[in-house]
């Protein structure tokens, strides 16, 4: 069975954890910004279907 030869240092572990947390923070910030733009109506990247009125009746 494969095992690591040496223990990973706390510094390396913390560095990897910080990178992971930074990516999660960036994703959360992007999602929040996108949600705000959708709610305010300033979103340019979405196509909303136009509700057509029933004129056949």
From Swiss-Prot:
Query: Which GO terms are recorded in the biological process aspect for this UniProt protein?
Result: translation
Give the residues annotated as coiled coil.
none
The cysteines covalently paired via disulfide bonds are none
Q: Which SUPFAM superfamilies match?
A: Zn-binding ribosomal proteins
What are the GO MF terms of this UniProt record?
A: structural constituent of ribosome
A Pfam family of the record is Ribosomal_L32p
Spell out the GO cellular component terms annotated for this protein, sorted alphabetically and separated by semicolons: large ribosomal subunit
Region feature (Disordered): 1-23
Q: Any idea which UniProt keywords this protein has?
A: Ribonucleoprotein, Ribosomal protein
Output compositional bias ranges, type Basic residues: 1-20
Q: Which PANTHER family match?
A: 50S RIBOSOMAL PROTEIN L32, CHLOROPLASTIC, LARGE RIBOSOMAL SUBUNIT PROTEIN BL32C
Family of this protein: Belongs to the bacterial ribosomal protein bL32 family.
Name of the protein in question: Large ribosomal subunit protein bL32
